[in-house]
C-alpha cells in the first residue's frame, strides 16, 4: 500500500495525469516500478498555525538525513494540518490548511537539505487536513494531526 501511495505521489508531483501520457511520464513509470522498499522514517509535530522546526525535531531530521545519505534513499515529505481553523468557510479552511501543510513539508525538506540530502532526492506534498490520524475531539488530537511525515524509499 505504501508503494502505491508513493507511486501516486510521485506521479502527482511530476505532473502526470496518467501513467501513459508523454515521454516524461513513461520515464517516471519505468523508475517507479523499481521502488524496492519504503518506510516511515519519522513524524514530527508542529504548534498550532506554525511551520517552525523545533530543536527536538531538528535532531530527528538530522538522524533521518544521515540514514537517507548512508543508505542512498530518496525522501517524500507529507505536510499535514489539523481540521480546525478560525473560519467556517470551507474554501478558506482548505486554502489555509493547504498553505500551512505545504509550509510544513517545505521547511521539513529544507532542514533535510541543510543536513546534506540533495534537493533532487526529496519530494514534498501538502495534504492539508485530508488525512487525519486522530479524530479531532480535543486539543491532543488536533496536535497529533499537525505534522509532517517523512518517508524514505529505495530504488533497485
Features from the language model and the residues they span:
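N-terminal targeting leaders that direct proteins to extracytoplasmic destinations
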Residues: 1-39, 50-52, 57-62, 149, ...
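Acidic/histidine-rich, surface-exposed loop or edge segments in extracytoplasmic proteins
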Residues: 37-48, 89
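Extracellular/periplasmic catalytic domains that process cell-envelope and extracellular macromolecules
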Residues: 36-38, 68-70, 141-144
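Periplasmic peptidoglycan-binding/anchoring modules of Gram-negative envelope and division proteins
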Residues: 46-85, 109, 113, 150
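A generic structural signal for alpha->beta connector loops
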Residues: 13, 72, 119-121
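Short glycine/serine/threonine-biased micro-segments
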Residues: 13, 77, 124
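Periplasmic OmpA-like peptidoglycan-binding domain that tethers envelope proteins to the cell wall
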Residues: 83-156
Amino acid at each position: 500500500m505504501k508503494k502505491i501511495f508513493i507511486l501516486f505521489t510521485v506521479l502527482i508531483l511530476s505532473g502526470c495525469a496518467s501513467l501513459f501520457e508523454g515521454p516524461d511520464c513513461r520515464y517516471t513509470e519505468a523508475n517507479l516500478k523499481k521502488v524496492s522498499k519504503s518506510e516511515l522514517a519519522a513524524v514530527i509535530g508542529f504548534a498550532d498555525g506554525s511551520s517552525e522546526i523545533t530543536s527536538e525535531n531538528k535532531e530527528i531530521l538530522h538522524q533521518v538525513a544521515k540514514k537517507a545519505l548512508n543508505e542512498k534513499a530518496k525522501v517524500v515529505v507529507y505536510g499535514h494540518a489539523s481540521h480546525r481553523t478560525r473560519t467556517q468557510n470551507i474554501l478558506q479552511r482548505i486554502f489555509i490548511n493547504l498553505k500551512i501543510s505545504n509550509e510544513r513539508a517545505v521547511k521539513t525538506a529544507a532542514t533535510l537539505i541543510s543536513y546534506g540530502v540533495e534537493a533532487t532526492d526529496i519530494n514534498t506534498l501538502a495534504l492539508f487536513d485530508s488525512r487525519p490520524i486522530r479524530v479531532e475531539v480535543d486539543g491532543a488530537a488536533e496536535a497529533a494531526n499537525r505534522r509532517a511525515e517523512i518517508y524514505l524509499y529505495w530504488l533497485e
